[in-house]
UniProtKB/Swiss-Prot annotation:
Subunit structure: Heterodimer of LeuC and LeuD.
Family listed: Belongs to the aconitase/IPM isomerase family. LeuC type 1 subfamily.
CC cofactor: [4Fe-4S] cluster
Protein name: 3-isopropylmalate dehydratase large subunit
Cofactor, how bound (note): Binds 1 [4Fe-4S] cluster per subunit.
Keyword Membrane set for record: no
Organism: Neisseria meningitidis serogroup A / serotype 4A (strain DSM 15465 / Z2491)
PROSITE patterns: ACONITASE_1, ACONITASE_2
GO terms, molecular function: 3-isopropylmalate dehydratase activity; 4 iron, 4 sulfur cluster binding; metal ion binding
Amino acid sequence: MTAQTLYDKLWNSHVVREEEDGTVLLYIDRHLVHEVTSPQAFEGLKMAGRKLWRIDSVVSTADHNTPTGDWDKGIQDPISKLQVDTLDKNIKEFGALAYFPFMDKGQGIVHVMGPEQGATLPGMTVVCGDSHTSTHGAFGALAHGIGTSEVEHTMATQCITAKKSKSMLIAVDGKLKAGVTAKDVALYIIGQIGTAGGTGYAIEFGGEAIRSLSMEGRMTLCNMAIEAGARSGMVAVDQTTIDYVKDKPFAPEGEAWDKAVEYWRTLVSDEGAVFDKEYRFNAEDIEPQVTWGTSPEMVLDISSKVPNPAEETDPVKRSGMERALEYMGLEAGTPLNEIPVDIVFIGSCTNSRVEDLREAAAIAKDRKKAANVQRVLIVPGSGLVKEQAEKEGLDKIFIEAGFEWREPGCSMCLAMNADRLTPGQRCASTSNRNFEGRQGNGGRTHLVSPAMAAAAAVTGRFTDIRMMA
């Protein structure tokens, strides 16, 4: 038998039918649903008189529009409230395997909630009307975002039409240095291959450095695969995967667990499997990263300086750099560690799990928010993350440092709720996109790891965490 990549195995096991042009009907195991991309899909079902094809495939929560403060006041924005209320009504009418409504302890960002509930399992196909669904590939699953029309198709038929991507292996060999996190690895890779480097590919991340990551770290990495242009990112199953999934609410039990684990252990790329493209990086080359521009690929080591567009020979790239520096209010040659920040945001589906909060708390402990920093928002990814963090006393560390301990939600990752930047504010953010206006009109976003964000919060500027004993 021909050696197969992990992507081959996941894809082939879910093909229902293939047309001559390569288009396939792909079966979907898990459908994650939130309030923003589901209303039109549910409305389409109603108009056609259809029901959900498989109620037990749907796991849902409200996240994008939910406020992360003043929960006693409810949702103040009328459009946000309408979307959340509509999700409540639709789930009540159509059903779901599980639903975690606004203010429920299980509620949270869909890409945090799914894995912690065991709704994401190795070998699954996972879709959601959200581009960062690639997060779930960390479990040896085939996961990617879909559009609203595909949300309806999945609800009605349990399938989507798709064409197979090319396969890419990105291996990071060696051991990561102290202070370097999965977020730094993700940003470094994007800086090397560009935001279009993975276009048309499904990326498998491998190598010693990747295998050494926790599941939280792997989720961060796969979350950012979309920012490299890929449709999906994935990591092969190993004992770390299995240990994380065990005893989760929706994980198999007893004999079913034993059979599942036996199968899950096959979810690795075979020896000799051929990828369409491969990259290999040395872990020792990776330093803590900071983005300086308006694309995730505009990223450098913390020890670097803002680049000079005049040194770029490609006129298109040079123009893009000039525009980015103008928007970001930066001058070429400025050391990154001299750039001050106004706001710090630690959260999002990229970095809001308890491991991320522990990293931030380790920096914040016995320190105070810098005087020039206006706000520091700490937003746990779910109610369960919040609960665990409070058990460990992380909330007290943040509050004593002068940070804001918030309720779970997508928060300042995107300007779709009350948490947003104002024009000109510069933010050290653990989110995944630094596009113009992403966090608010005129807001300036720098992507960093949770530890780097916490360091910026207490020093008032971007700071190499390795210099902070």
